[in-house]
Amino acid sequence: MNKANSFNKEELIACGHGKLFGPNSPRLPVDNMLMMDRIVTINDNGGEFGKGEIVAELDINPDLWFFDCHFITDPVMPGCLGLDAMWQLVGFYLGWEGAEGKGRALGVGEVKFTGQVLPGAKKVTYKLNIKRTIHRKLVMGIADAILEVDGRQIYSATDLKVGVFSDTSTF
């Protein structure tokens, strides 16, 4: 298992193919749905709650796929993609901890949007504070997160929940 404290784009893509933490670990999406270019830091003892943190980044450029279709003449990154990135990172954290199975978003307590990601932005930064992880019959991670664009916080989410399941056929 790879317990590194940072990951580059190639390693994140490898996670999507089951080649970073192993073939049975939770996977990140690949291609357009992978909403980060790097994980700058990941640990299991930092953050606001002392139970772990993740900081990840997405480089923004006007050629990103979503700017062409959301919206015509008013391009903006869909807020749901930033939220999905937060869930992706909670699932990644569980795989980094050694969980096996398929990751699924289970919910979120509250989401607030107070700004937007436009094509002229340079960088999105995701900052997650792990609140709790459970590794029993139920494997689940819970985190609070913010999204910053060029250093300005524009999204926040509390109680992001991701579960890892050995069987999703009845989910």
Swiss-Prot record:
CDD domains listed in its UniProt record: FabA
An MF annotation (GO) of this entry: (3R)-hydroxyacyl-[acyl-carrier-protein] dehydratase activity
Catalytic activity: a (3R)-hydroxyacyl-[ACP] = a (2E)-enoyl-[ACP] + H2O; (3R)-hydroxydecanoyl-[ACP] = (2E)-decenoyl-[ACP] + H2O; (2E)-decenoyl-[ACP] = (3Z)-decenoyl-[ACP]
Pathway(s): Lipid metabolism; fatty acid biosynthesis
Entries under InterPro entries matching the protein: FabA (IPR010083), FabA_FabZ (IPR013114), HotDog_dom_sf (IPR029069)
Record-annotated active site: H70
HAMAP family listed in its UniProt record: FabA
Purpose: Necessary for the introduction of cis unsaturation into fatty acids. Catalyzes the dehydration of (3R)-3-hydroxydecanoyl-ACP to E-(2)-decenoyl-ACP and then its isomerization to Z-(3)-decenoyl-ACP. Can catalyze the dehydratase reaction for beta-hydroxyacyl-ACPs with saturated chain lengths up to 16:0, being most active on intermediate chain length.
Family: Belongs to the thioester dehydratase family. FabA subfamily.
Protein name: 3-hydroxydecanoyl-[acyl-carrier-protein] dehydratase
Taxonomic source organism: Shewanella baltica (strain OS155 / ATCC BAA-1091)
Lineage start: Bacteria, Pseudomonadati, Pseudomonadota, Gammaproteobacteria, Alteromonadales
